[in-house]
Design a protein with these regions (language model features):
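Intrinsically disordered, low-complexity linkers and tails enriched in Lys/Ser/Pro/Gly that lie
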Residues: 1-96
Length: 96
């Protein structure tokens, strides 16, 4: 049962994407739910994996910001909260 739940959460983690009309906080809430679920079943997801997942899962409207982050930050060292703050600030600058 535990293995089945873990496999379902792993699949959800891999497939989760942010849609163009979704707010970043909503997307991150869903992603964080999956990460916490996996942790509760005994599997820790490395921060660098979560950072890369977030950057891969953002819609086209975030493309310029993703490129900037990838070029200027060490993705193995950036803190998830730092990334979240940066993306939330960027989202506020997007036309609504």
């Amino acid at each position: 049962m535990k293995d089945t739940k873990l496999q379902m959460l792993t699949t959800r983690f891999e497939e989760l994407k942010m849609s163009e009309d979704e707010l970043f906080d909503s997307f991150y809430g869903k992603l964080n739910e999956v990460v916490i679920g996996k942790f509760n079943l005994g599997e820790k997801t490395e921060d660098s994996k979560v950072v890369r997942k977030i950057l891969r899962s953002l819609p086209e409207s975030f493309h310029a910001k993703v490129i900037t982050i990838e070029k200027t930050k060490d993705l193995d060292e950036i803190k998830i909260q730092e990334l979240i703050g940066s993306l939330q600030t960027y989202e506020l600058s997007l036309p609504s």
